[in-house]
Amino acid sequence: GKSTMLRAIGGIFSADEGTIDLHGHSISLLSIGVGFQKKLTGRENILLSGMVLGFEEDYIRERMNDIIEFSELGEFIDRPVKTYSSGMYSKLAFAITAILETEIILIDEVLSVGDAKFKKKSFKKMKSLISGENRTVLIVSHSIDTLQKLCTRVIWLHDGKLKMDGDPKEVLTAYDEFMSE
């Protein structure tokens, strides 16, 4: 349900009922298995992904080296994405999302992917994206620790319905107690 909701907000799925209005904001979905053309190289996918997100080609090319550097893919950037491990795939997806900085970022359980060094770097970048800008970041995660450290508001959905909405500490404590029953 939660991943489906993110994909509907991101425009990948259409909602069965109701409407989703993004008020013209650019949006990116960071989710394992979504968004890349497997036969294209990482570099080609950066360009394609950026254009799909609505960015001008010149802007994407200006940010290309920053994306490649952040992704830590080195020479693999010029190999087809189909040859990437899931960690490499996630690093590239995160780097594109983090460096191009859309107004709305949707994150589906991918902050825990990659080696310890990359996780730390990603967490730091995500923290700066959330706190330093006028941006909406929607995270689907079961990691209470991650949500406590990153979020200023938490919404708990259960069986497709809103269970609780508010302060991260309050909502996550209630969630943890509920899951322990």
Task: Locate each region found by the language model.
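H-loop/switch region of ABC-family ATPase nucleotide-binding domains
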Residues: 141-142
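Helix-to-loop junction immediately C-terminal to a conserved catalytic motif
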Residues: 10
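Conserved ABC ATPase "signature" C-loop
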Residues: 159-160, 175
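A short, surface-exposed alpha-helical micro-motif characterized by mixed small hydrophobic
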Residues: 147-149
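Conserved ABC ATPase "signature" region
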Residues: 28, 47, 59-76
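ABC nucleotide-binding domain "signature motif"
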Residues: 16-27, 162
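ABC ATPase "signature
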Residues: 165-166
